């Protein structure tokens, strides 16, 4: 079971534990992951992810799962998230053609 965010690909980071006497020892910072189900309004479908708390807060801030994916650059997204982003773009393009 890898500790990687399914949307952003965020993994553990490294740093130092600093004591009161300023002695430094190496340590790792693990990602705070949660199993969540996110709903896509455009696709009318649910997706299950294991995502970090930071990503979940960002999704809420952006206004939902669909808007988060559309506003985030593809370089910052994992392969799975990029595929869903393409599906959302395709669905919105089809909806625009139908409404015209």
UniProtKB/Swiss-Prot annotation:
Pfam families: Ribosomal_L28 (PF00830)
Classification via InterPro entries: Ribosomal_bL28, Ribosomal_bL28/bL31-like_sf, Ribosomal_bL28_bact-type, Ribosomal_bL28_sf
Transmembrane feature ranges: none
Molecular function (Gene Ontology), one example: structural constituent of ribosome
GO terms, biological process: translation
Any one Gene Ontology cellular component term annotated for this protein: ribonucleoprotein complex
Keywords, comma-separated and alphabetical: Ribonucleoprotein, Ribosomal protein
Protein family: Belongs to the bacterial ribosomal protein bL28 family.
Name by which UniProt lists this protein: Large ribosomal subunit protein bL28
Species whose genome carries this gene: Ehrlichia ruminantium (strain Gardel)
């Amino acid at each position: 079971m890898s500790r990687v965010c399914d949307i952003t690909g965020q993994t553990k980071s490294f740093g130092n534990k600093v004591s009161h006497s300023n002695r430094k020892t190496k340590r790792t910072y693990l990602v705070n992951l949660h199993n969540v189900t996110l709903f896509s309004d455009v696709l009318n479908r649910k997706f299950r992810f294991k995502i970090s708390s930071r990503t979940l807060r960002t999704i809420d801030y952006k206004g939902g799962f669909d808007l988060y994916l559309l506003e985030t650059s593809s370089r910052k997204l994992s392969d799975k998230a990029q595929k869903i982003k393409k599906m959302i773009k395709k669905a919105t393009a089809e909806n625009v053609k139908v409404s015209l």
